[in-house]
Amino acid sequence: MTIGDLGEFGVIGRIAGRLPQGAAVLLGPGDDAAILSAPDGRVVVSTDLLIEGRHFRRNWSSGYDIGRKAAAQNLSDIAAMGADPTAIFVGLGLPADVTTDWLDALTDGFRDECALVGASVAGGDISGSDTVVLGVTALGDLGGRQPVTRAGARPGHVVAIAGRLGHAAAGLALLQAGRADGGDLVDAHRRPRPLYACGPGAARLGATAMLDVSDGLLQDLGHIAEASGTGIELDPAALPVAPALAEAARDLGADPLEWVLTGGEDHAFAAAFPGDVRLPSPWLVVGRVIEGKGVHVTGRSGTAGGWDHFR
């Protein structure tokens, strides 16, 4: 059966029936708008757009993978502000020939990723489309904490990361080479695994600037450097290159460090902390904030690279 057979309201009912609501949702799907509690009095909001052929391919990723990925990249933005995600809203553009099984898998992917952080899919919209288009808006609560923006890094602070780097880029390279059997690396492209708790955890540790690495470490740290009016120096010897990453690079004739520095969509967290802070695992110090501008990698030349939607 296809969603065209169900019709718009049949599709909406099918989606809503698979989505339990958490405590933050006072009124969920079914009315003109949802109502959420806001204990902190401030609401953190982020939105992202995913377009078939640009951000995912249905012949590479299942509906479930795509739902998990779309939720993850929005939930990680909320966590990167030091907030706890509470809900997401999903706008769907779908071709009429999409099967109900695929739709169920997509819905379950959204639901299961949200469940990792205690969030809910609290509403959304649906429309016909020539290709699959997903618009996701995520909300979060600061729990009385100050938000961690990109603008607080100062010379003398350390730069640390929490999460994997380069894995999604390596997985994409393997898929492009026809290596869909690329194991954990391909899975990292299909379904990133942000360490959500590290976002609010960093805020409690005193992080002065933070973001999630969606467009590549160099490019994203460049945003912190620009917003903070500082430079950042990275130590390449401190950057983690997993054995699987090194092996894939050998097979494809690539530089694994290039994946680590410029690969996007791992949604690791990168943050600046005062130099005297003792950071627990999984935080790993990889550089320092310096006077100046831009991001510099010791022993390497060139400009920061990464993902740009218009290049």
Model regions and ranges:
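Glycine-/charge-enriched secondary-structure boundary and capping motifs
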Residues: 1-20, 61, 95-120, 127-134, ...
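Small-aliphatic-rich amphipathic alpha-helix that forms the alpha element of a beta-alpha
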Residues: 63-87, 108-116, 200, 218-224
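Short, compositionally biased
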Residues: 169-186
